[in-house]
């Protein structure tokens, strides 16, 4: 973590109940992920949040893994969460196999890299992330042309989860960890 003074200090040492997840993060990323040091003040809630995202990211999820990463990246950008943009950009780069899509997310409306279904989902993610959420009838109809009710429900849960995560991290100024390098090569 950078030597920036935090207005809410991260934990220097994690509770015993979070040591297993810290070990997994250390092995996979080479470090304990920054948000863990803040969520660590509430280990039970941390595990509930981890279970929530774990369910949304399960192998038999209703949404394609690349679409999930795309939506999480866009919500992270809207919430201006440095850590989330970094982590979700890495996930999107890994799942799409290229950095060009990652670099085009913020300008998705002007990019040919996104499918019609991705465009509809991105518009929905932006509408749900707005405060208050404003989803138009046209957006609802467009969603139904590409996704079923179960997929839309799961998409909404994913967007809501990413809003929770990004707003928590952004409010506490949790920094990026350089997981997805700016030079076009993802780490890990």
Language-model-derived ranges and their functions:
Residues 1-188:
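Hydrophobic alpha-helical segments
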């Amino acid at each position: 973590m950078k030597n920036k003074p935090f207005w809410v200090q991260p934990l220097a040492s994690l509770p015993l109940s979070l040591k297993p997840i810290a070990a997994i993060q250390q092995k996979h990323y080479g470090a304990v992920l920054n948000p863990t040091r803040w969520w660590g003040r509430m280990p039970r809630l941390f595990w509930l949040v981890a279970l929530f995202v774990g369910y949304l990211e399960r192998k038999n999820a209703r949404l394609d893994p690349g679409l999930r990463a795309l939506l999480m990246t866009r919500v992270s950008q809207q919430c201006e969460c440095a850590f989330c943009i970094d982590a979700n950009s890495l996930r999107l780069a890994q799942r799409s196999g290229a950095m060009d899509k990652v670099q085009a997310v913020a300008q998705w409306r002007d990019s040919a890299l996104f499918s019609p279904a991705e465009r509809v989902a991105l518009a929905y993610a932006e509408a749900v992330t707005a405060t208050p959420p404003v989803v138009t009838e046209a957006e609802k109809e467009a969603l139904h042309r590409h996704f079923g009710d179960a997929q839309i429900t799961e998409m909404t849960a994913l967007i809501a989860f990413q809003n929770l995560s990004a707003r928590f991290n952004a409010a506490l100024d949790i920094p990026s960890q350089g997981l997805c390098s700016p030079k076009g090569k993802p780490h890990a």
